[in-house]
């Protein structure tokens, strides 16, 4: 499958280029996000003060904006860094963590979407449903309920925001508005580790840093986490559980090869 082959090639590009990935992210998973980028072969920097974000992002190959733990200062930094990244052609990925939890989060994401062009948006289905129903409207789409129809929602969302969207969950879906990819890899234990979604966003950003194909970068990032989850679970012994599982995720990503993706990836691709 072409998409699987092309996404697998990203692994070696990362190891060769060692791209700098700028994060403005939350303090819950920041250490894990830094380490996951390192495990894949990139170089993380977690700068979030308005006094330095423009300078830092100018040296980066991709920018992560994650709203997990918001405050006014961090929002200012997100806007400054995002605009500068757009100006320089640096890819930007949005992770709207818990966007439906508060008006502040929704207002912030609305502001970000109005002021920054995002290369990829990654979140879970409930977060994406909130984005779909926000007042920021393109082509008259204001409020829609897709009743669990993820393929329809993700296509509409990608078209609405003119971006590539990745919805992660039991089955992962990635769409650029035209091509829809469903990924059947992963393990249920991933949902019991705080920050695996944030780490997946960081993996996608690292992939974005070495390709201009956002759909393939999003696919590669999702597959890397899913296959690492499968491998980590398979390696557990009878007395080992969630803590060992988390550590093994990093081990498996560090040992990941192009062949791992080619042999392990399970995809379904449709076009429109």
From Swiss-Prot:
HAMAP family per UniProt: Thz_kinase
E.C. numbers: 2.7.1.50
Matches recorded under InterPro entries: Hyethyz_kinase, Ribokinase-like
The entry's keywords: ATP-binding, Kinase, Magnesium, Metal-binding, Nucleotide-binding, Thiamine biosynthesis, Transferase
Catalysis: reaction(s): 5-(2-hydroxyethyl)-4-methylthiazole + ATP = 4-methyl-5-(2-phosphooxyethyl)-thiazole + ADP + H(+)
Disulfide bonds: none
Protein name as it appears in the record: Hydroxyethylthiazole kinase
Cofactor: Mg(2+)
Binding site for substrate: 46, 195
Pathway named in the protein's UniProt entry: Cofactor biosynthesis; thiamine diphosphate biosynthesis; 4-methyl-5-(2-phosphoethyl)-thiazole from 5-(2-hydroxyethyl)-4-methylthiazole: step 1/1
Family: Belongs to the Thz kinase family.
GO molecular function: ATP binding; hydroxyethylthiazole kinase activity; magnesium ion binding
Claim: Methyltransferase is one of the keywords in the record: no
Lineage: Bacteria, Bacillati, Bacillota, Clostridia, Peptostreptococcales
Amino-acid positions noted as binding ATP in the UniProt annotation, renumbered to this chain: 122, 168
BP term (GO), one: thiamine biosynthetic process
Species in which this protein is naturally found: Alkaliphilus metalliredigens (strain QYMF)
Function recorded in the entry: Catalyzes the phosphorylation of the hydroxyl group of 4-methyl-5-beta-hydroxyethylthiazole (THZ).
């Amino acid at each position: 499958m072409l998409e699987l082959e092309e996404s697998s090639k990203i692994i070696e590009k990362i190891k060769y280029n060692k791209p700098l990935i700028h994060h403005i992210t939350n303090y819950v998973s920041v250490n894990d996000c830094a380490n996951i980028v390192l495990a894949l072969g990139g170089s993380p920097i977690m700068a979030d003060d308005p006094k330095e974000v423009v300078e830092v992002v100018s040296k980066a190959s991709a920018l992560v904006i994650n709203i997990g733990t918001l405050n006014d200062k961090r929002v200012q930094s997100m806007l400054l860094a995002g605009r500068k990244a757009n100006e320089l052609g640096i890819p930007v990925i949005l992770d709207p963590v818990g966007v439906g939890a508060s008006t502040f989060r929704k207002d912030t994401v609305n502001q970000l979407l109005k002021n920054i062009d995002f290369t990829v948006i990654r979140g879970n289905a409930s977060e994406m449903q909130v984005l779909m129903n926000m007042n920021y409207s393109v082509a008259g789409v204001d409020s829609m309920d897709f009743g669990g129809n993820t393929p329809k929602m993700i296509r509409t969302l990608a078209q609405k925001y003119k971006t590539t969207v990745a919805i992660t969950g039991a089955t992962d879906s990635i769409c650029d508005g035209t091509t829809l990819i469903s990924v059947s890899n992963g393990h249920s234990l991933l949902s019991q580790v705080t920050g695996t979604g944030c780490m997946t966003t960081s993996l996608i950003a690292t992939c974005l840093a070495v390709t201009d194909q956002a759909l393939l970068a999003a696919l590669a990032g999702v597959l890397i986490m899913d296959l690492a989850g499968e491998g980590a679970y398979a390696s557990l012994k009878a007395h080992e559980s969630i803590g060992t599982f988390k550590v093994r995720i990093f081990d498996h990503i560090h040992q990941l090869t192009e062949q791992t993706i080619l042999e392990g990836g399970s995809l379904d691709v449709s076009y429109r």
